[in-house]
Amino acid sequence: MQPNINDEVSNNAVLDYMELHQHLSEKVEEEAKIDFITFVRLMAPKLISDWKMGKHIEVISEKLKQLESGEIKRLMVFLPPRSSKSVICSKLFPAWYIGRNPEHEILTVSHSDQLSSDFGRSVRDLVNEEDFSKIFGGVSLRSDVRAAGKWKTTQGGTYYAAGVRP
């Protein structure tokens, strides 16, 4: 039985699609390494299943990117509850920052030790994600210091979590 030309075309189209998809994924990962909003779009759905982008997320993300680059020195974010402040500022941004600067120290302070530890756990878990490794290859956690409130990278960086109240 001779191969059908339509089957051959279909197989080639599938292979072309797979190659294009792989190339696009690599480009997005490269962009996520340098652009925080791209990182947010890629990683936020891992934290919130029904994640939706809003203009306020784009504005905050741009300001956080400027903070990381040193363009601005301080940033205060004021938004109503349930506006994704914690997801962006206390989970995704520290993960992106440590991916770009794995030798730095980060301190997260919240109103309670428990909330700070919860943030630390989320950031640590993001750093352990396979997608994070694709973006920031080579950044990994030390196996001997991995508590939610204090963990270290193999590059010498440290994440600390502290609360104003116990």
Each predicted region: which residue ranges?
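Short alpha-helical patches at coil-to-helix transitions and adjacent helical residues
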Residues: 57, 86-91, 113-116
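Residue-level preference for the first positions of well-ordered beta-strands
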Residues: 74-76, 105-107, 158
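N-terminal accessory segments
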Residues: 1-72
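Alpha-helix boundary/capping segments in eukaryotic regulatory proteins
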Residues: 83-89, 99-105, 110
